[in-house]
Amino acid sequence: MVPPVETKAMSKQNHPARWTLWTTVFCSFLLALFTPQLSRAQYKADHIPGFAGLESGTQAPPGIYVGDLVWIYPTSTIKDNDGNKVGNGSASLTSSLDVILGSVVTNYKIFGANYGTQVALPFIKNEIQLNSLDVSSSFAFSDMIVSPVVLGWHLKQADVMAGYNLYIPTGQFSATGTGNTGLGMWGNELTLGSTVHLDKTHSWNAAANFGLEFHSSKKDEDIKVGDIGTIEGGLSKTFYKKVSGPIPMITNVGLAGYSQFKITGDSGSDIPLFLQGYKDRVFALGPEINTFIPKPRLTLLFRYEPEFAARNRAQGQTILFSIAWVAKSLAKHP
């Protein structure tokens, strides 16, 4: 037993320590209470959902393609683990991205599939890092995407596509920065998708593509973003219009959607306590129209997908425009 006098002496000596402890706990509570835009929102992955939609399981015919894609994502909402809106909604953010695309689909066969490859050079403004709306960055180069292997099979009533995407941390990243244009980590993604033709004329199509993404630790931080699953696809109707020349104008109209969800939670000693043990998810659904114009060999696309049922992440709207040009056709005609 400790003598009473020594007990009082120890109590006086430990009082500053107890004060510091309770001050820390109280300040942590205030931080969690008055920084709602970060509440339980998870670290972002490389794959931005909504880049694929109708016929997402179909590889393009053999050829050399170049294109440009514009992605706009306005949001003023962060959802918590129960789906409730966090904060008063006064903050807002619009993240935007421009991607220069180049791809080649060859006649070379691997396991009966056409072999292809693709590279994407992205430029982003307001890169969302932690589903926080406290982001401000100028338009600058982001993390590069290389797809060294893309395989496409074309069956009688279905198409199948499989591939591998490598996300290279070429964008600006600082562990303490709010103006980053990259995520500061390497990403690897395996993809598998299919487009099923629902009638003999291939005018009705249902498609889905699944990507499994996993990551390295972030630069200068003991943080590893959890594995991510992304499903993108849609249901479409194809219309053909005769124009001058042998190839008709082809238009796809339909409903596109996506879901993205964390399969495993974020890990590492640098993850704040109030972010540990949670996983995020989101769904989106909306219209898409794309048209191939044969004479200039251009494909124009518009997709709009408002998000819903988000958990532990931002909930906004995906708006996407793209244009692709067939620089050279490599298709073999009988």
Which ranges hold each PLM region?
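Sec/Tat signal peptide C-region and signal peptidase I cleavage site
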Residues: 34-41
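Surface-exposed strand-loop-strand hairpins of Gram-negative outer-membrane beta-barrel proteins
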Residues: 43-44, 73-97, 131-137
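Outer membrane beta-barrel transmembrane domains
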Residues: 50, 79, 85-86, 220-334
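Short loop/turn motifs that connect adjacent beta-strands in outer-membrane beta-barrel proteins
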Residues: 55-63, 107-116, 153-160, 198-204, ...
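Residues on the lipid-exposed face of transmembrane beta-strands in outer-membrane beta-barrel proteins
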Residues: 56, 68, 99-106, 146-151, ...
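Residues that define the transmembrane beta-barrel architecture of outer-membrane proteins
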Residues: 62, 92-100, 135-145, 182-188, ...
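Transmembrane beta-barrel strands of outer-membrane/channel proteins
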Residues: 66-74, 117-123, 162-168, 208-214, ...
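Outer-membrane pore/translocation modules
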Residues: 113-116, 122-226, 276-280, 294
